[in-house]
Every structure is written in structure tokens, then in C-alpha cells.
């Protein structure tokens, strides 16, 4: 996983509440097992008019000024529903680095973090301000300081200390384990021979 320290990008507002994992990535795309390639299917039912991938010009992700946005501003209960990690894969593959919501489905919140996406919880008044940013306005998210810096104000956010450490250092669960490789080897060496 890449380190997440300070990130600057532009925003796209999708202010719906209760966007569930089936809306983020419909079930028919769960057959793929590689993390790459899911971005094409993100918000499939909203982004496309038909199965030929004809873009819906009214959907905000398809509007030219928002195509490069990497910070999603959204409503409450983002990522509720089934526990499919594929939804986080789709968000990451599309290019999202930060998601600002009123709340998250618990499992989806962890899936985002495990895939290098920073989920940030903010109240409605903050999200409403961020949703009014121009498509070219840059927002900086500083994980060290736990702050969002934007043209409409600066906002603090909370994050669990363990997750913060993992993101700042680019560590997934395997990376955390490998930090203790010497101790693990020593433990294995000291085990009785009948375990070898």
C-alpha cells in the first residue's frame, strides 16, 4: 500500500444518502478477482445509459470538469449494505483517494482504509460547504495534522491511531506483520523440534 501523508486534489459532490455497495459496484462485476479494472464499473447504474457503456451526461462523474476529481463528497451512510471489498477496489481504481461522508457502513469504512482510501466523517454543514467548491478548487488533506484545507474553510477530522499509523507508513496487515519478522523467526527457532 502507498503511504498517505498529505494529499491535494479536486472534489466531486454526490450528496445522496445511503449509497450502498451494490450502487457503488453492482453484483454482476464481482466475478473479477484482480483489484485493477473495477473503476470502469463504479456507479455503473448511474454512469451509463445502457450495457454498451453509453455515458449518462447528467451523471456528475461524466461531466468533463469533474472527470479528474479524486476527493468524493457524499451523504450519510456511504457504503452500507453487503461487505464486498470490490466496492473499495472500484473507488480506488477510479482514482478516489479521499471520501468525505456523514457516516460509513462499518465494513466499507475498513475496506476503504485497507485499500489506501482515507474515509473522513464530517457533519452536513461541512459537507455542504465542500460540495459548493468549483471543480477546479483544490483541497488538501493532511493526515499528519488530521485537517482538511479548502477555499471554504479548514476542518479537523478524527481517525483511529492504528489506522493513521498504517496509512502514514503505507502498511497493510502483511506489512505490519513483516515489521516483526526477526521476532517471528526467533520464536520459530526457539520452538520445540516436534513443531518443525
From Swiss-Prot:
Entry annotated with the keyword Amino-acid biosynthesis: yes
Pfam families in alphabetical order: Aconitase_C (PF00694)
Keywords for the protein's UniProt record, in alphabetical order: Amino-acid biosynthesis, Branched-chain amino acid biosynthesis, Leucine biosynthesis, Lyase
GO molecular function: 3-isopropylmalate dehydratase activity
Pathway: Amino-acid biosynthesis; L-leucine biosynthesis; L-leucine from 3-methyl-2-oxobutanoate: step 2/4
Swiss-Prot/TrEMBL catalytic activity: (2R,3S)-3-isopropylmalate = (2S)-2-isopropylmalate
InterPro entries recorded: 3-IsopropMal_deHydase_ssu, Aconitase/3IPM_dehydase_swvl, AconitaseA/IPMdHydase_ssu_swvl, IPMI_Swivel, LeuD
GO CC annotation: 3-isopropylmalate dehydratase complex
A GO BP annotation: L-leucine biosynthetic process
EC number: 4.2.1.33
Homology family: Belongs to the LeuD family. LeuD type 1 subfamily.
Subunit structure: Heterodimer of LeuC and LeuD.
Function of the protein: Catalyzes the isomerization between 2-isopropylmalate and 3-isopropylmalate, via the formation of 2-isopropylmaleate.
Protein name: 3-isopropylmalate dehydratase small subunit
Native organism: Streptococcus mutans serotype c (strain ATCC 700610 / UA159)
High-level lineage: Bacteria, Bacillati, Bacillota, Bacilli, Lactobacillales
Amino acid at each position: 500500500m502507498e503511504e498517505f501523508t498529505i494529499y491535494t486534489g479536486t472534489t466531486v459532490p454526490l450528496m445522496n444518502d445511503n449509497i450502498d455497495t451494490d450502487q457503488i459496484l453492482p453484483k454482476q462485476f464481482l466475478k473479477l478477482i484482480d483489484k485493477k479494472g473495477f473503476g470502469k464499473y463504479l456507479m455503473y447504474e448511474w454512469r451509463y445509459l445502457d450495457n454498451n457503456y453509453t455515458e449518462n451526461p447528467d451523471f456528475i462523474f461524466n461531466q468533463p470538469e469533474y472527470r479528474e476529481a479524486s476527493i468524493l463528497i457524499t451523504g450519510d451512510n456511504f457504503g452500507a449494505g453487503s461487505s464486498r471489498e470490490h466496492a473499495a477496489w472500484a473507488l480506488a481504481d477510479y482514482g478516489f483517494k479521499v471520501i468525505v461522508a456523514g457516516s460509513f457502513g462499518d465494513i466499507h469504512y475498513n475496506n476503504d482504509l485497507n485499500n489506501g482510501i482515507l474515509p473522513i466523517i464530517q457533519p452536513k454543514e461541512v459537507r455542504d460547504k465542500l460540495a459548493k467548491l468549483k471543480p477546479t478548487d483544490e483541497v488538501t488533506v493532511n493526515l499528519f495534522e488530521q485537517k482538511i484545507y479548502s477555499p471554504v474553510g479548514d476542518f479537523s477530522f478524527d481517525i483511529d491511531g492504528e489506522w493513521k499509523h498504517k496509512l502514514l507508513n503505507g502498511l497493510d496487515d502483511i506489512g505490519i506483520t513483516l515489521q516483526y519478522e526477526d521476532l517471528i523467526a526467533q520464536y520459530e527457532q526457539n520452538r520445540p523440534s516436534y513443531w518443525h
